[in-house]
From Swiss-Prot:
Keywords: DNA-binding, Nucleus, Transcription, Transcription regulation. The gene is foxc1b. GO terms for molecular function: DNA-binding transcription factor activity, RNA polymerase II-specific; RNA polymerase II cis-regulatory region sequence-specific DNA binding. Residues 338-355 have a biased composition (Low complexity). GO terms for biological process: anatomical structure morphogenesis; blood vessel development; camera-type eye development; cartilage development; cell differentiation; cerebellum vasculature development; determination of heart left/right asymmetry; determination of left/right symmetry. It comes from Danio rerio (Zebrafish). This is Forkhead box C1-B. It is found in: Nucleus. Residues 74-168 bind DNA. One of its GO terms (cellular component) is nucleus. Monomer. The keyword Transferase does not apply. DNA-binding transcriptional factor that plays a role in a broad range of cellular and developmental processes such as eye, bones, cardiovascular, kidney and skin development. Acts either as a transcriptional activator or repressor. Binds to the consensus binding site 5'-[G/C][A/T]AAA[T/C]AA[A/C]-3' in promoter of target genes. Upon DNA-binding, promotes DNA bending. Required for cell viability and resistance to oxidative stress in the eye. Promotes cell growth inhibition by stopping the cell cycle in the G1 phase through TGFB1-mediated signals. InterPro entries: Fork_head_dom, FOX_domain-containing, FOXC1/C2-like_FH, TF_fork_head_CS_1, TF_fork_head_CS_2, WH-like_DNA-bd_sf, WH_DNA-bd_sf.
Amino acid sequence: MQARYPVSSQSPLGVVPYIPGDQGFYRTATGGGYTGMPAPMSMYSHATHEQYPGGMARAYGPYAPAQQPKDMVKPPYSYIALITMAIQNSSDKKITLNGIYQFIMERFPFYRDNKQGWQNSIRHNLSLNECFVKVPRDDKKPGKGSYWTLDPDSYNMFENGSFLRRRRRFKKKDVLREKEDRDRQGKDNPGQACEQDAQQPVKLRDIKTENGACTPPHDSTPPLSTVPKTESPDRSGGSACSGSPQSQTPQQAFSMDTIMTGLRGSPQHAAELPASRAALPGSVSLTYSPTPQPAHYSPPCGQPATYHCNMQATSLYTGDRGHGDDTLPEYTNTTNASSISHPHQSSSQESQHLQQNRLAPWYLNQSGELGHLSASYPGQQQNFHAVREMFETQRIALNSSPVTGSNSCQMAFPSSQPLYRASGAFVYDCSKF
């Protein structure tokens, strides 16, 4: 019985033997089996033959190789663009008509056929467009035909140098008109430039004056927005920042002069305080100027009215960030509330002071945060412990004494305790936290 399929040769690689290219793309079986069964294609070669035989160049055997389809597509360039390419590609930036034909046919195979049609279009575009200038041939060079070149003003007729996009049809009269307009504007510009130069110093001076950094006579006081919650202990500076009269300063802020005079007992330290504070611009201020609020504002009934604030932590942090170490002992004092404990002061101002002191709890006595300052400021630490013991005794005395007053929002100020206020059994002691 004869085999239906051809048996391949016993080669070490087990591939189909080489089939010559003249047998076509397909070949039928050699036996008497199914004659229509396709056999392996000729693209498979024998191991001993070269990897890519010459017969593979022809895809369909006896047929001639077809031209690539992309060469038969018309280029997306206009005839003006093609002529411009040919002129710019030449060495002298000028070319004959025959040179234009040769350039187009070499670069674009599409124009190798139907030469009569597109060559006629090339001649029409050379004659009708003003961007192409005809240059007579020099007698020294042999040949016939004139040269064609580009008008010097037409080099920018294509957008960004792309031959696919042309701005507009080049016309010589439009170019002349544009030149006249530019010349006219150039004559008018010097007068405008002089006027602008004459007005420019005035504008710059006005801008500098508005910014507040122009002339030396102006006050260089920083604006209120830069220091919203701190102010200098000087009464005149505090009144200027808060916008209140100088007579109201002792009622709206702590009076550091009276505190330092009362505790130190020497007016010299009180006189040196404003000067020493001026040397530390970035320090935390010990005086608070509350923002003015309506007179009918009152704290809630359950709000504690008695508090003990020790601002020594503030002074220590101030000394850590300050510039002078000799002025630090001036700040190691407890805050005296005598100015706000006056019996005739309104409850709204007292509540404002209470809220201002509540806003900065992290400055107050915290042993964990002040531990790293003990080595640098031993004198301040000793004074701090002494003041704390004094506050402890006052707190114990307040807790043991009977409470005077009612449950209303009115605050009572006992005459025996001029430095502290108490309206209930609850005592808010900042020094123990």
